[in-house]
């Protein structure tokens, strides 16, 4: 479970970061 959660977070975090970067 934690493995899947970590993988999901690793994929989501950069995505969110990119979104904020593009907005800025």
From Swiss-Prot:
A biological-process GO annotation: defense response to fungus
Location(s), subcellular: Secreted; Target cell membrane
InterPro entries from the UniProt entry: Antimicrobial_4 (IPR012523)
Superkingdom assignment: Eukaryota
Tissue expression remark: Expressed by the venom gland.
Keywords of the record: Antibiotic, Antimicrobial, Cytolysis, Fungicide, Hemolysis, Ion transport, Membrane, Secreted, Target cell membrane, Target membrane, Transmembrane, Transport
Primary subcellular site in the record, as a coarse category: secreted
Any one of the GO CC terms: extracellular region
Annotated family: Belongs to the non-disulfide-bridged peptide (NDBP) superfamily. Medium-length antimicrobial peptide (group 3) family.
Subunit annotation: Homooligomer.
Known role: Disrupts cell membranes through formation of pores. Has strong antimicrobial activity against Gram-positive bacteria B.subtilis, S.epidermidis, E.faecalis and S.aureus. Is less active against Gram-negative bacteria P.aeruginosa and E.coli. Also increases efficacy of antibiotics (ampicillin, chloramphenicol, streptomycin, kanamycin, novobiocin) when tested against E.coli, probably by facilitating their incorporation into the bacteria. Possesses antifungal activity against C.albicans and hemolytic activity against human, sheep and pig erythrocytes.
Name of the molecule in the record: Pandinin-2
Organism from which the protein derives: Pandinus imperator (Emperor scorpion)
């Amino acid at each position: 479970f934690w493995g899947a959660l970590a993988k999901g977070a690793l994929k989501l975090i950069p995505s969110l970061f990119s979104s904020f970067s593009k907005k800025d």
